[in-house]
């Protein structure tokens, strides 16, 4: 769990996302409250429930990007999922409880990685012994083993090919099926690979690879042998229950508009009804055991382009008490997006073309013209937010990208005149620009 202060979280998000301070503050406070809750006495800790967030804003203003960056900051089980992927219980498709099952799998992966670090030194010695056995055989003398161990540690044998016995993971890819009549009926998807893996007693197969490649494989195997799998699962479930975060994107797409109800929209409303107990707090059965969702934080977001937030079920609105509106992007925002973030689009294109030996130089008036064009096209055609910059830059640099491999060593300056020359038709003919995306 991250111990960043809200101010630190916002400044971290500022490195990648321009503007939207209200949304950044809301998620920063929510994330910090997770840490604050952990410091409370146990009795009070159970009473403090997370305040779920609803982010509203037009497409392309940074809702999903905030979620992506938050996932890296959270240091907790985090799942980003689209609400449109789910269907009402009883229909063909995935039901919303699958969200928690997926979150548990993510938590198990995170917990295993953390616990592997604790046994890394032991696992490294065991992996080294297995590599030595493959190199010199099981019956080699101690002197020979020591000689090869020294060469191994100095990296002299990294390119040597060896054959090693590793776990056969091919059974893991077998299909899954629902088990009828199990508690909760959705206990779901028992993996045939798990069943066959246990029945076959963990089959092994011989793989041929270089010494350097074998280390990662053997380290993972030996670490897992040293880990208590039950401890991994119980810690992962505890982590989900106390620190889990779910980001529900495109929630506006499952609203039934007030003037159009019936038909397929009933199924959409069904998904909302299924989400109610999940967000409020329920127990979900997974193959690893029951998981309580009382303290899982839900952040929902949607453009609400055709529907309104009030079209959500009133009960669902009540379970998303913190409402944050993200603002549409202006010309000045576009300019900042092109220049300020650590991995801004201009830096990306410069780096890509530098691999061909070309130097790109954007002047200030060239960047201003790009921002103005993007804002104009968004106003006159369809407002798709910052994604419009991808369209404009791809069109602008199309010729340069195509011929870059033949122009190594050249330097190209992109100023306002160059931008107008390349994108003249795009700016003048709005009907034509509809065909770009």
Swiss-Prot record:
Pfam families recorded for this chain?
A: AAA (PF00004), AAA_2 (PF07724)
GO biological process per UniProt: protein unfolding; proteolysis involved in protein catabolic process
Q: What is its main location?
A: cytoplasm
Keyword field = ATP-binding, Chaperone, Cytoplasm, Nucleotide-binding, Stress response
Q: Where in the cell is it found?
A: Cytoplasm
**Gene3D superfamilies, per the entry:** 1.10.8.60, DNA helicase RuvA subunit, C-terminal domain, P-loop containing nucleotide triphosphate hydrolases
Q: Which residues bind ATP?
A: 18, 60-65, 249, 315, 387
List, in alphabetical order, the Gene Ontology terms for molecular function in this entry: ATP binding; ATP hydrolysis activity; peptidase activity; proteasome-activating activity
Q: Entry's CDD domains?
A: RecA-like_HslU
Could you give one GO CC term from the UniProt record?
A: HslUV protease complex
The record's similarity note reads: Belongs to the ClpX chaperone family. HslU subfamily.
Say what the protein does.
ATPase subunit of a proteasome-like degradation complex; this subunit has chaperone activity. The binding of ATP and its subsequent hydrolysis by HslU are essential for unfolding of protein substrates subsequently hydrolyzed by HslV. HslU recognizes the N-terminal part of its protein substrates and unfolds these before they are guided to HslV for hydrolysis.
User: Which HAMAP family does this chain map to?
Assistant: HslU
Q: How does it assemble?
A: A double ring-shaped homohexamer of HslV is capped on each side by a ring-shaped HslU homohexamer. The assembly of the HslU/HslV complex is dependent on binding of ATP.
- Official protein name in the record: ATP-dependent protease ATPase subunit HslU
Organism field: Rhodospirillum centenum (strain ATCC 51521 / SW)
